[in-house]
Amino acid sequence: MSNFLSIHQGIQRDSDQIFIGPGSKELLYQSVLIFEGHFIIPKGSWVSYIPQIKSKGGTYSVLETALEDNFKLTANCLEAYLSESLHSEHILVLNSPNNPTGATYSDVEYESLAAVCRKYKVIVFSDEIYSQINFLNAHSPSISKYYSEGTIVFGGLSKVFSAGGYRLGFMSLPKELKHLSVVYSSLFSETFSCVSSPVQFAALKAYKYSKELQHYVA
């Protein structure tokens, strides 16, 4: 998984910074439970983000996006919100390529957003479940390239490899948040034991990402 992230998404994470679970939805939800802070959701987002936050009694704001920006959150919009926010800690949930809009953030857009997130010490949940599905570019960028220290990356088998029934997801912590590994491990051990063995074998084949498989996916 570490090699896959490095080669295909430009994300440098060691194996001990990566967790595997029964789907990225589960790992996202566990992260929502662990982090205390005010959540920021760009308008036009996956259906489960807000219900997950509500289920823990968390607070959130939905930031407007516009057609002229291809329904993507802009750095100016994020800066304007954070500069007036009364909350001390924030978690931004980004999804690119996006469900439901299909929009994909560019390197330039991510670099601008990263600068704002760094300024305000925002934690980013980067949902990259569709990372290899991009019909416009050779790859979909990751905000972790520009803001590694504050970005937790999520992904999984279901979308990229057309394997919705194979429940396996991953999340990767930056080294700056590696101290949370103990917290995650404790929560994971009390909520799920492991991913089923047959699915793990399928994932091993998928994440080796042969040229034949890459052609099929791309």
Question: Model-flagged regions — what are they?
Answer:
Residues M1-G21:
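Conserved N-terminal alpha-helix of the aminotransferase class I/II PLP-enzyme fold
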Residues D14-H38, R167-G169:
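Conserved beta-loop-alpha segment that forms the PLP phosphate-binding cup at the N-terminus of a helix
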Residues I34-I53:
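Conserved PLP-anchoring active-site segment centered on the Schiff-base-forming lysine
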Residues I41, V62, V124-S126:
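Hydrophobic residues in well-ordered beta-strands that form the structural core
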Residues G58, K119-V122, E149:
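A short helix->loop->beta-strand "cap" motif at the edges of active sites that frequently abuts
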Residues L67-A138:
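Active-site phosphate-binding strand-loop segment of PLP-dependent enzymes
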Residues K145, G150-A218:
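Conserved core segment of the aminotransferase class I/II
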